Amino acid sequence: MTRRTPLVGALVAEGISFVGTRVSMIAIPWFVLSTTGSATQTGLVAAAEIAPLVVFKALGGPLLDRVGPRRVTLVCDFLSAFVVAAIPFLHGLGLLSFPVLLVVVAVAGALRGPGDAGKSAMGPEIARVAGFSLERVSGLAAAVERSSSMGGAALAGLLVASVGAANALYVDAASFLVSFVVLGVSTTGLGRPVPGEVDADATSYAQELRQGWDFLRTEPVLIAICAMVAVTNLIDQAYSAVLAPVWAKESGAGVAVLGTLFAVMGGSSVVGALVAAKWGETLPRFRTYVIAFLICGAPRYVVMALDSPLWAVFAITVVAGVASGFLNPILGAVIMERIPAPLLGRVSSLNTAICWSLMPLGGVLGGLLVAGLGISPALLVAGVAYLVTTMAPTRVPSFRRMDRAPATREPVPSGV
């Protein structure tokens, strides 16, 4: 095994997982929308998955530090395969009522939270072993995420059209199992607790959670990022879970076009992510972050709200995708370089949980906007909200600290 084997294995495992996740992101909303005809119920299902995901991602941070992120990730991926497979299995037996669906997707979300956090927490160690910078590894991870999302979105459109939305979820279940095997084989010996730093016997679980918060709240740039990304994630969740599927259904574009649209977004963002991986270290972080967010956000919503032709929707999506590819490499480097190794699991999990904290409301908000205003006004409102949010870094001074190297920090003592 070479020093780059863990990096390659982690990227492959994550890519496979993202393919399955993208399939479920399209298949589940389409399944609910097709069987119930309700945008509100579609939003509720999205909220039922995201809410426990956020909660368990936040609460699982100390577990990652105590047990090790690799072990947590492997267990969560293995169990997730069977939970996701339960949806089409129960549907085939005629046992998948709406309340049962809510419970199953909630369990899936609860497992995905710490599982995803574990993958992220292994990033700095994998980068160190491979001899790569955080910007480069974050850029490669973003490129894999975007390209896998592109393939998964296209695959989702084909699967839903051919075998149905419920049966398409078997692909997501299989992706968890394959990811489990690849990650387990390629990262042997990595992802263990930091010895001598995190003493599980000396502090309680609650104190370790408090340590994570005590550190995070003293980093103004991380708090600013969390607040902004929480709002943009809220709007994006409304888009992917409700607004885009309803637009595709009401415009007559259909699920195939919806899948292609997501695939184009993912594919074009790969270009941006690869550029960021290659030259990200030389780009000014703050300026790149602001410009990329302005381009990838509001225009997507406005072009759909104006009932533009499909070629215009796809053209804007391509440009937005390229811009979005620059975001995760910047965010990943800024966040990870500021967190001490002994606190990495709990702080990174809490950071991500805050960024995702409003997402459970995204689907519900999207459903309410469509029900109250109609799809075009709902898209326009979402686009304006996105524009206002992406202008925030120009008015909040702490964002400019992105371009500064972090000072050496000592672990924050536990509070009582």
Task: Enumerate the predicted regions with their spans.
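Membrane-interface helix-capping segments at transmembrane helix termini in multi-pass transporters
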Residues: L33-G43, A86-A110, V129-S133, L159-Y170, ...
